[in-house]
Amino acid sequence: MSIKHWPEQERPREKLIQQGAGALSDSELLAIFLRTGTQGISAVELARQLLAQFGGLRSLMSASREEFCQGLGLGDAKYTQLQAVLEMSKRHLQEQLMRETVFASAEHVRTYLSSQLRHSPREVFAVLFLDTQHRLIRYQELFMGTIDAAAVYPREVVKAALQYNAAAVILAHNHPSGIAEPSQADISITDKIKRALDLVDVRLLDHFVVGDGLPVSLAERGLV
């Protein structure tokens, strides 16, 4: 049955207007994004099938272009639309945090880093550069690929910190597997970067590992 024949309170768009986006299921939110279904399949049913195919919303949103376009009813138009929505969300959150004290609590940092890194299909090493009040000066993704001593150069972090006149930095990287447990390589590179930053009087406040769930803080584990 077409969605237009559903009771009004069950239609995703009307439900969002009446109850807010938080009241919608993943499939209902995705149905609004899709707008239409395919022949004989409503947008909500198509959304359910896609979530089952990709293994959930996270996997769908972080899929590569090739993987995404293999989904029923999906193509380049929907892929570019999704990327635009994700980028707008990132920029909106960054604008908010530019006006706030980033390190007022670790939760501010966790929220921001989750939005930036959780959906990336590859490993990304990023740095938050902060002023003396711990306000965000700049977020920059410095390295891509496997995070180890050969891929991350402490001097590049120091160079960028001096360029932005940062008083402190927060490191972050994601684990595309979704498992946010820090590795020995993560701990080792954190120590190397901390010692390099100490030489130029820039504080390393923390290093977060982003996966599914809450990002893990190395500082909270006594590893910074």
Swiss-Prot record:
Residues involved in Zn(2+) binding: H173, H175, D186
Give the UniProt record's GO annotations in the biological process aspect. Answer: proteolysis
Locus of motif JAMM motif:
173-186
Any GO MF annotation of the entry: metal ion binding
- Report the InterPro entries cross-referenced here: MPN, RadC_JAB, RuvA_2-like, UPF0758, UPF0758_CS, UPF0758_N
Q: Top-down, what is the taxonomic lineage of the species of origin?
A: Bacteria, Pseudomonadati, Pseudomonadota, Gammaproteobacteria, Oceanospirillales
What family is this? Belongs to the UPF0758 family.
According to UniProt, the name of this protein is UPF0758 protein Mmwyl1_0624
MPN domain sequence ranges:
102-224
Key words, A-Z: Hydrolase, Metal-binding, Metalloprotease, Protease, Zinc
Q: By its UniProt entry, which Gene3D superfamilies does this protein fall under? A: 5' to 3' exonuclease, C-terminal subdomain, Cytidine Deaminase, domain 2
